[in-house]
Regions:
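Sec-dependent bacterial lipoprotein signal peptides
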Residues: 1-4, 8-31
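Acidic, polar-rich low-complexity tracts and alpha-helical solenoid repeat scaffolds
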Residues: 27, 31-279
Length: 279
């Protein structure tokens, strides 16, 4: 029994060893072929290799092949495909910045090319994917909004329009949320270094104007009410009633728009406080 077990174990070890040798040989052959292609001076061979690597989803290698032959094929019938596949390879690598740059290069060179519609969509999608957290700089978000709007305008019948609209609303909501965060910050700063309550109100009002369909409308309208209430509570005596009257007006703006809003209890408390001052 022990002898049979030992024999089987030995056979497994030998099989694993052979398999390892085969895999290493294949890997070395593959690496050797890639190195050879890098050194090749034949652009057609590199073009075909790049397409093969792209089909195999070996995007790092396809990027290398295509980048090396872009200058050679410039002005030729193959230039369009080379440039587009290079952009697609960067997309496969999830290098959205580089991908967007090459998609745009494609559009500049081939505005009516075979892949023009897809390239324009991919530019917008790259910006969308590169859009950061709302707390960070939103340049990519603005770029995404512009590119998505442009795609919808240029290709209104495209089956991607619905998807683009969803991404567009998402990007606008992100900007609205950033303005909500800024409004909250101003409200919390209060009178530190100046009247930040006014800055809070202005920021929130601008967000409501710029993004009227945002899902943060409830929060934005409420932060205006809250800021005006806090400002009124810190007012000098001769201005207090006037400012609390504005608070009451602001309450009805909120309550009429959001009778079951998530801030309605706090809004009702603010109303009671305001009425006690104004009466």
């Amino acid at each position: 029994m022990n002898a049979q077990f030992a024999m089987r174990t030995s056979q497994c070890i030998i099989m694993n060893y052979k398999l390892t040798i085969i895999l290493l040989s294949l890997l070395l052959t593959s690496c050797g072929e890639y190195v050879r292609l890098q050194k090749s001076t034949d652009p057609e061979e590199k073009f075909q290799a790049g397409k093969n690597y792209f089909q195999e989803k070996k995007y790092t290698k396809s990027v290398t092949m295509f980048e090396e032959i872009v200058p050679y094929y410039r002005g030729t019938p193959q230039a369009e495909e080379v440039l587009y596949l290079l952009a697609e390879s960067y997309m496969g690598q999830k290098d959205y910045y580089s991908a967007s740059e090459y998609y745009q290069a494609y559009l500049r060179n081939f505005p009516r090319g075979t892949y023009a519609q897809e390239a324009r969509y991919q530019v917008a999608y790259c910006y969308y994917l590169d859009s950061p957290d709302a707390r960070l700089d939103q340049e990519a978000t603005y770029d995404a909004i512009n590119a998505l709007s442009e795609f919808i305008s240029v290709y209104p019948e495209s089956n991607k329009v619905s998807e683009c609209r969803k991404m567009l609303f998402e990007m606008e909501d992100k900007l609205a949320y950033k303005e909500l965060l800024n409004s909250k910050l101003y409200c919390n700063l209060g009178l530190y270094g100046g009247n930040n309550y006014k800055a809070c109100v202005t920021t929130a009002e601008n967000a409501l104007r710029d993004y009227p369909e945002t899902k943060y409308r409830d929060d934005l309208v409420f932060i205006i009410l809250k800021a005006k209430s806090k400002e009124a509570s810190l007012s000098v005596a001769e201005k207090m009633k006037e400012r609390y009257s504005e608070v009451i007006d602001e309450y009805y703006r909120y309550a009429n728009a959001f009778p079951d809003g998530k801030h309605i209890k706090e809004a009702n408390r603010i109303l009671r406080e305001a009425k006690n001052i104004v009466k």
